[in-house]
């Protein structure tokens, strides 16, 4: 679960939410209150944290914290 913990840290910092709110099933927009700009900034922060590039077409498919976990596990 180390990847989840790292992602959670970035999400808490970028979206200014309580750590308890960030669960694998949490949706960035509906549950965590992100807008489209927040999502773009979050993707950029995740790319930097994990030293990966998330193409726009893939970023558009990422709606939940779990989606990010699976993407990073698959593409790291």
From Swiss-Prot:
Pfam families: PP-binding. Residues 1-76 form the Carrier domain. 4'-phosphopantetheine is transferred from CoA to a specific serine of apo-ACP by AcpS. This modification is essential for activity because fatty acids are bound in thioester linkage to the sulfhydryl of the prosthetic group. It comes from the Bacteria. The modification O-(pantetheine 4'-phosphoryl)serine is found at residue 36. PROSITE patterns: CARRIER (PS50075), PHOSPHOPANTETHEINE (PS00012). Keywords: Cytoplasm, Fatty acid biosynthesis, Fatty acid metabolism, Lipid biosynthesis, Lipid metabolism, Phosphopantetheine, Phosphoprotein. One of its GO terms (molecular function) is acyl carrier activity. Its main location: cytoplasm. Belongs to the acyl carrier protein (ACP) family. Carrier of the growing fatty acid chain in fatty acid biosynthesis. NCBIfam families: acyl_carrier, PRK00982.1-2, PRK00982.1-3, PRK00982.1-4, PRK00982.1-5. This is Acyl carrier protein. The gene is acpP.
